[in-house]
Amino acid sequence: MADEDLIFRLEGVDGGGSSGAGRHGDSDTDSDDDEGYFICPITDDHMSNQNVNSKGQGYYNNLLKTECGSTGSPASSFHFKEAWKHAIEKAKHMPDPWAEFHLEDIATEHATRHRYNAVTGEWLKDEVLIKMASQPFGRGAMRECFRTKKLSNFLHAQHWKGASNYVAKRYLEPVDRSVYFEDVQLQMEAKLWGEEYNRHKPPKQVDIMQMCIIELKDRQGQPLFHLEHYIEGKYIKYNSNSGFVRDDNIRLTPQAFSHFTFERSGHQLIVVDIQGVGDLYTDPQIHTEKGTDFGDGNLGVRGMALFFYSHACNRICQSMGLAPFDLSPREQDAVNQSTKLLQSAKTILRGTEEKCGSPRIRTLSGSRPPLLLRLSENSGDENMSDVTFDSLPSSPSSATPHSQKLDHLHWPVFGDLDNMGPRDHDRMDNHRDSENSGDSGYPSEKRSDLDDPEPREHGHSNGNRRPESDEDSLGSSGRVCVETWNLLNPSRLHLPRPSAVALEVQRLNALDLGRKIGKSVLGKVHLAMVRYHEGGRFCEKDEEWDQESAIFHLEHAADLGELEAIVGLGLMYSQLPHHILADVSLEETEENKTKGFDYLLKAAEAGDRQSMILVARAFDTGLNLSPDRCQDWSEALHWYNTALETTDCDEGGEYDGIQDEPQYALLAREAEMLLTGGFGLDKNPQRSGDLYTQAAEAAMEAMKGRLANQYYEKAEEAWAQMEE
């Protein structure tokens, strides 16, 4: 068979072969037996099955030598070619699982196929021939599935018995046509992250099934269907978009993959709802920071919080340098129950796993794919760039109390990275095309009903007719793909970020205040944990919700610059009314008073007007002032002035106007302080009279005529003292 007759290139694979090809019903356990060859069971010679483990290990070692040494020899290339050709011959002679349904006898339909390129963000159109069963063979909460055969565009004759089996899915209830396109975008974006995960050489590689849209032009209304390959095997749901993990399906790889996507994307997204056959996944869900992409299943930071509440870091997470998410002691005890179950998983680490963000990995991080360009920029800084890690310290400094326990993760100190300029990156090796795509045929599960976001509209563009190759999400040519990726906004590079608060705090400490408050997605995740605890999501109906854990996450959110958390803790520790965790009251101690005032002062510096007034009054009257401070009218005057000038958005992006404290009242208090002097403030009758006049004018605007007259009189009295 000539090379050009293949629908994929014959070349060496980086750290593993095609994931998911040939997965079967036994794939619900992490067995290491199917990894003796990187080209999995379909290529195993029946004469060498007894030596598969030893030969597989030798093959793996030779592959490592090839990667680290020369670019490869003709002998090694020949080995790959023969293995792939052998696999193709075996695949050709496999029986058709749908032969009994005689789909070849169904009428042929013309369809327009829409495929999405996740790298360029473009939609491509071509024409295909299909045969679809009239009755569904499976039905879920939202969609139903139809057996389908699609004829390859490479064929010159219509040989339907040899056509590939597909699953066509459509929604049970009518939905906007844009929903179909949005679903494909989601799955192809998730496929990109699966490929990024595989570049870090995990023990088991993953793959997301290829999915496209077919438009049946000859039917009334030209209905749309999702189209995926059919894959035999046992379909398992490993986690959901609401953080649920089945105890009898505990596995390491799916959970580690979700955790990896959160850190590798710089906290901008997480891929969850992992389900499929073995490590060939379908119908995933992506949670993004704002939650405005990818339909109603995108729960935003709340979905991220739900995942980490139930996630127990496993040995794959540790081998890839993924930092554990901070949980309270009580939450950690609950997660430890899952940790015990993880001991039964059979995945064996090879010891060659790359750390997340390792300089040895030539990833596609030279620029952002369209999804990351669409996401909120809050998690990144304008001058931030993706730099290689070999010039950085291998462990964080001890600036925070939890730094020492994170040294083994080899995360760099982020404080010096946010203001660095772009650096040259090594070009990535040509990315191989993938023909591994399919589906278990299982209908999609219903998305979570936790949210009801505003509807989104996503259009699509038409492209030229493309060859039949079911290319992976990076396109049909690895070389073209990498060149295209590198052309996309090379100045906007993203850096992996750990899930640990201590390391995120180090990064934020290097930023100025305006770029620190409200800029951490990790802080928003911890704040979402607070809301879930307060709402009773993490407890049974007849149980009290965990107040200690809620305060734990509220403090972590405040440490990460979440203004709402900072204000809430300031009010809570100061024994003042607070809207977040309103039922929680803390003991009134000097230590808590100091904490409360420090939080309020931090919130005031961040632009929260209510906190400015509280701090000013504390310095003015001495009430609610921390024990280590004393009355200071000059400080009070400063914060009164700042509050008066604050009429726009604070650093958290929220608008806080002057309705809570009338402007004329603050001006009158300033005038009174300057008229009498004291507590470090010198008398200034002239300025006092001016402020009384401004207060009178503000009172007149507020329809307070009698009060305005009083202020005018006091202004005259102040100016009289100046003349004396």
Curated annotation (Swiss-Prot):
Modified-residue entries (N-acetylalanine), positions: 2
Primary role: Threonine kinase that regulates protein synthesis by controlling the rate of peptide chain elongation. Upon activation by a variety of upstream kinases including AMPK or TRPM7, phosphorylates the elongation factor EEF2 at a single site, renders it unable to bind ribosomes and thus inactive. In turn, the rate of protein synthesis is reduced.
Biased composition (Low complexity): 364-376
Regulation: Undergoes calcium/calmodulin-dependent intramolecular autophosphorylation, and this results in it becoming partially calcium/calmodulin-independent.
Biased composition (Basic and acidic residues): 421-435, 444-468
Region (Disordered): 11-35, 353-476
Lineage of source species: Eukaryota, Metazoa, Chordata, Craniata, Vertebrata
Annotated family: Belongs to the protein kinase superfamily. Alpha-type protein kinase family.
InterPro entries attached to this UniProt entry: a-kinase_dom, Alpha-type_PK, eEF-2K, eEF2K_a_kinase_dom, Kinase-like_dom_sf, TPR-like_helical_dom_sf
Keyword entries, A-Z: Acetylation, ATP-binding, Calcium, Calmodulin-binding, Kinase, Nucleotide-binding, Phosphoprotein, Serine/threonine-protein kinase, Transferase
Name of the top EC class for this enzyme: transferase
List of residues that carry Phosphothreonine: 347, 352
Gene Ontology MF term list: ATP binding; calcium ion binding; calmodulin binding; elongation factor-2 kinase activity
Protein name per UniProt: Eukaryotic elongation factor 2 kinase
Regions of compositional bias (Polar residues) in chain numbering: 385-403
Keyword Nucleotide-binding attributed: yes
PANTHER family: EUKARYOTIC ELONGATION FACTOR 2 KINASE, EUKARYOTIC ELONGATION FACTOR 2 KINASE-RELATED
Post-translational modification: The N-terminus is blocked.
Bias (Gly residues): 13-22
Reactions this protein catalyses: [translation elongation factor 2] + ATP = [translation elongation factor 2]-phosphate + ADP + H(+)
Enzyme Commission code: 2.7.11.20
SUPFAM superfamilies linked to this entry: HCP-like, Protein kinase-like (PK-like)
Domain of life (superkingdom): Eukaryota
Any one cellular-component term (Gene Ontology): glutamatergic synapse
